Amino acid sequence: MVHSQTPNPSTLPAESSLVYAEPQLTEELLERFDSFAQKVARHDGVSAFSEQTRIELSKALRESTLTPPRFFVAEDNGTLAAVFVALTPANDEDTGVIEAAVAPEYRGRGAGSAFFDHAVRQLGEDAVRYRLWVHGSATDTGIESPAHAFATLHGFEPVRVLYKMVLPLDAQTREELVERSDARTLPENLRMRTFTGADEFPWLRVNAAAFAHHPEQGKLTLADLRERTGSPWFRPEGFFIASEMEDNSAIAAFTWTKIPTGQEQGELSPSGEIYVVGVNPQAQGGGLGRTLTLRALAYLACAEDENGEPLRAIDLYVDADNTTAYSLYTSLGFGVATVDRMYAPAQQDAPAA
């Protein structure tokens, strides 16, 4: 839910009647959603919608999902004033995810609150099965933030904290990352290589095992994987796999990097991301995660964006309660930049999604 910076009331549009709808998803509507999401991200400095939400909308458009998301809009004479997306639970034991945003020029007048109430009511009794993501708080306090106040006002309470950690890159840091990677070796029975199309199913199996208890990553499907590998940002040379010497399908660990396209130049931009690090449960405890993480960091330290600009920072996301990973990343020089929080309906004991 977008939460930062309330516009000056004098800049708000004249009072108008917003029309709520749950429209049929079309290519044109998805393009309008993308433009809306980009406008919100430019204003707030953080995206209100996750990559998975965009992927689920794309899958629904192609009718390649059995659980299409619910998509609600508030429109003002053809302009998207607010959007509410509910990713549908995959089964009776699963929970869904809500992400929503209000256009900057429509904030501060209760439009978002009224629309949010309307959309939640449309979910009916299933509303208690959903979790609300709030992205990009500047610190881990959150208690005074407008987003926290909004969530609690609507009967939600925080249940999960996700850190975005950032490592600025300079000449010394780049050199140190390469040296650290070069100093690591794999066991004699393993080799380092990069992803190919033949790795799809072996990777999905290992990913599911490595993230069996992870709310999002462990649920990735073949369609989800292909959405990502078919994206403009995908670079197979940045997807590292440690597999058995004699059997490529026997994957012991992997690290996937991401360099988003279309980034603006800034102090910490363009940046690359440690997208995901996974270790086969049967291979855990041998330091493979650290070895592959360092290989990915060394790659990003020397990488460029699509325009040939060297990366100026590396970022990643880690759950606050994953103290092992957090300690690893802080030891490598990462610091917490922003905090995402997941909220659940108050008094609900179901697991977070």
Predicted regions and their residues:
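Acyl-donor-binding surface of acyltransferase catalytic domains
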Residues: 1-14, 91-92, 104-188, 343-345
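Short amphipathic alpha-helix that is part of the acyltransferase structural core
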Residues: 2-60, 179-218
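Active-site/acyl-donor-binding loops of N-acyltransferases
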Residues: 2-4, 148-176, 294-298, 307-353
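Conserved donor-binding loop and adjoining core beta-sheet/short helix segment
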Residues: 22-24, 30, 34-140, 251-271
